[in-house]
Amino acid sequence: MAHKKAGGSSKNGRDSAGKRLGVKRFGGQQVTAGSILVRQRGTTIHPGANVGCGKDYTLYALVDGVVSFERKGKDKKKVSVYAQ
């Protein structure tokens, strides 16, 4: 009898959609209050002057101004917004 043994099921073959994380406004760019500057998982970049931090660690501008990325100590980064 020509039978075929049942094939095993694969445990692979899934992937999640990208979450569109990263820097949304770069250094030197003009922004308005409420503009999202960085979307991130955890505080990869810390909030500086005139920047707020959402519950999902999204950094956003609190005032109109110019974006500036700076160092915070030796090994941390921060983003600030300076009013023009």
UniProtKB/Swiss-Prot annotation:
Database matches in HAMAP family: Ribosomal_bL27
Protein name: Large ribosomal subunit protein bL27
Keywords: Ribonucleoprotein, Ribosomal protein
Top-level taxonomic group: Bacteria
GO biological process, one term: translation
GO molecular function, one term: structural constituent of ribosome
Chain positions covered by the region annotation Disordered: 1-25
Similarity-based family: Belongs to the bacterial ribosomal protein bL27 family.
Keyword presence, Repeat: no
Cited InterPro entries: Ribosomal_bL27, Ribosomal_bL27_CS
Alphabetical list of PROSITE patterns matching this protein: RIBOSOMAL_L27 (PS00831)
Entry's Gene Ontology cellular component terms: cytosolic large ribosomal subunit
